[in-house]
């Protein structure tokens, strides 16, 4: 039962009128919470200014925050949700976090149907309030970017339903402790609690499972916010309307199995020597234009990588992810909301080429894969260790051999490929670059280096997935 701080007739909106609530909420756009209402009462009462969502409820809508399952505005069935966004270097917006919908009760979940599910009711009618996260500002000074009642398209809701059924099936199989964000596409079961060690009982196993909540993935929310992304869905042919995404992609790419990269380049008018060849080829095989992004992949945060197998099934290089800035890495405090965490908790699509007897790479197929829970934990350990080393100060260790630039080799104590054989850190630049404590410089620091907290700089780094993980996966799947 909602408890209002003032008599209902004194509220600045009509709590029994949906239009009145939405119009009142939309007055926040372009303003801050401090501009819009008295926030002092909340800060002194709650003693915690980190809960902006609760402050919106308490100060702006003037009701007591609660954890009840009923809608926040029960008279009209409207659910209030807040979500932070961040502005990227290209000025576009991306979701900083997933949009949490509701906590998961494993024991109750197995008795729900999709139509009666708690998560469907939470998505039924949402009032979404989005604010721009700027870490240098007080939370009450964040500007509100979007306020509205978004509707989820039917084609997306079909994917979300499949995701929900995937999660329920895992709980019914007694595998709630093995749930991973990579199991699903748009809807995920993310860890939720004081720490990842917060656990709950599950109905069909004695193994305690991490406490989780249903949430729309940050990749899905980014596709909603960033209207500059040109999304194009994979066209379905007659009879493919009910085909799942993975089966659809495998069928499309399967049409070209046996063709070499050179033949495929000729077929689609692509240059195999171009850096963008692999990405453009995947789009071409799926019938998506070169200038557009694959809608289903963008919304699901699917990471696509082209894998080149040698004749013996080995891969020459580890699998890289985008380079990171050390300042951005340290600004990430929660694993699941970190850039690397989002990747590890989403699906991968490996497009597989294998060298034939003529020494030419030919397409063998594609494989979807998500990291098992224990691998996600190992990747998290790498992320945490990297942050720890950077915070304490990266050690530069000079070696004996000299490089082409005339300076000795320089090792460091970031977690390398032998750290846990799952994920590691290594350079992500074609040329090395350093700035030392005495101000001396090696290489092009502005282009190839990232600044450390102590003012030194070192070659840009990125997280890498160990090639042995992918080699074993593909071997087990018959490549």
What does each model-found stretch correspond to?
Residues 1-479:
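Nucleic-acid endonuclease domains
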């Amino acid at each position: 039962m909602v408890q209002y701080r003032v008599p209902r007739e004194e509220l600045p909106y009509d709590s029994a009128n949906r239009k009145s609530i939405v119009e009142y909420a939309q007055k926040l756009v372009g303003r801050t919470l401090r501009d819009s209402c008295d926030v002092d009462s909340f800060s002194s009462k709650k003693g915690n200014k980190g809960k902006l969502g609760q402050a919106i409820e308490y100060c702006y809508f003037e009701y007591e925050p609660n954890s009840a399952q009923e809608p926040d505005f029960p008279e009209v069935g409207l659910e209030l949700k807040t979500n932070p966004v961040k502005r990227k270097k290209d000025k576009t917006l991306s979701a900083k976090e997933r949009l949490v919908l509701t906590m998961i009760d494993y024991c109750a979940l197995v008795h729900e149907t999709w139509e009666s599910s708690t998560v469907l009711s939470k998505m039924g009618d949402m009032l979404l309030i989005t604010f721009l996260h700027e870490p240098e500002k007080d939370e009450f000074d964040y500007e509100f970017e979007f306020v509205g009642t978004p509707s989820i398209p039917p084609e997306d809701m079909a994917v979300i339903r499949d995701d929900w059924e995937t999660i329920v099936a895992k709980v019914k199989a007694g595998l709630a402790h093995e749930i991973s964000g990579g199991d699903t596409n748009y809807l995920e079961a993310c860890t939720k609690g004081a720490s990842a060690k917060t656990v709950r009982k599950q109905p069909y196993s004695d193994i305690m499972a991490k406490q989780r909540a249903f949430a729309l993935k940050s990749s899905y929310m980014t596709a909603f916010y960033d209207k500059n992304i040109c999304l194009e869905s994979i066209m379905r042919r007659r009879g493919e309307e009910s085909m799942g995404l993975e089966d659809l992609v495998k069928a499309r790419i399967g049409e070209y199995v046996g063709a070499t990269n050179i033949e495929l380049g000729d077929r689609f008018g692509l240059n195999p020597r171009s850096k963008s060849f692999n990405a453009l080829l995947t789009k071409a095989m799926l019938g998506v234009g070169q200038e557009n992004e694959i809608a289903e992949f963008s919304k699901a945060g699917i990471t696509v990588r082209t894998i080149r197998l040698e004749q013996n099934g080995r891969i020459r290089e580890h699998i890289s992810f985008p380079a990171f800035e050390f300042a951005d890495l340290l600004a990430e405090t929660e694993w699941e909301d970190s850039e690397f965490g989002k990747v590890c908790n989403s699906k991968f699509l490996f497009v597989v080429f294998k060298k034939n007897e003529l020494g030419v790479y030919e397409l063998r197929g594609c494989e979807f894969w998500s990291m098992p829970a224990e691998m996600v934990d190992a990747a998290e350990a790498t992320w945490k260790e990297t942050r720890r080393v950077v915070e304490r100060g990266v050690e530069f260790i000079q070696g004996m051999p000299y490089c082409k630039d005339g300076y000795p080799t320089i090792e460091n104590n970031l977690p390398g490929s032998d750290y846990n054989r799952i994920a590691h850190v290594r350079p992500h630049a074609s040329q090395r670059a350093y700035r030392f404590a005495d101000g001396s410089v090696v290489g092009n620091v502005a282009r190839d280096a990232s600044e450390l907290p102590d003012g030194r700089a070192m070659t840009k780094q990125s997280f890498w997935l160990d090639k042995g993980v992918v080699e074993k996966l593909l071997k087990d799947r018959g490549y």
